[in-house]
């Protein structure tokens, strides 16, 4: 009957309105309680989350010194759903924690803020540093998802001995998500860190993710082959879906010597 159809429409309208109210309420709470500035992660907090035992004997070429590296950061991100969202400034200091797992593998956790953490486990084999596992943890008002996915087959991140002009392309699965990534070494350069000149190669990385969380990721990495760390890292990331994330940030290494855990 007509009143049943009308009642069904009312129910659908009420459910949709309730969903909008929940999203708006969450964004409003975040604005009132946390403002528009993300929180910086301290060295101590980053050290607490360094995976592995710290120092390992005879690390392979391509394995960086373990510890916490501090980076000056300038950036922002937007978190939201559809037209509703909040832009928040990222803190002026980011931390990257490196933990040695074995002589040929290590984990890197990039603390862009307390609310945005990126992690990768790397393995070194066949002249390449490869990504084996990736983590993305983004929260809003303490609510979010710590997404961890195995990468199969492990894509190539950077050659152990990179050369200008090298290019490579990989297709892999991040869990159930298909990913295509292409990289090239654009040029050699030199950056100064703490008064010391550091030779680097500039790597351009472009990736596209499909599936339930589609998005794009564009990176420019000023990579130190000798130290196996980024001296400068520029990230542009866009993730779509029910929840959306846009990140624009640049990190500059403050000190070549990491803060290490006590042995």
Can you describe what each PLM-predicted range is?
Residues 1-4, 47, 159:
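Short hydrophobic/aromatic-rich motifs at helix boundaries and adjacent loops
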Residues 105-159:
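An acidic-aromatic
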Residues 18, 22, 26-27, 42-45, ...:
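N-terminal functional modules and adjacent low-complexity/disordered segments of proteins
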Residues 1-2, 128-129, 195:
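Intrinsic structural disorder
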Residues 2-23, 28-29:
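N-terminal Sec-pathway targeting helices
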Residues 1-6, 90, 111-112, 133, ...:
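Extended hydrophobic/Leu-rich segments
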Residues 26-123, 170-263:
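Acidic, serine/threonine-rich low-complexity disordered tracts
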Residues 141-193:
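Secreted/surface-exposed cysteine- and glycine-rich disulfide frameworks
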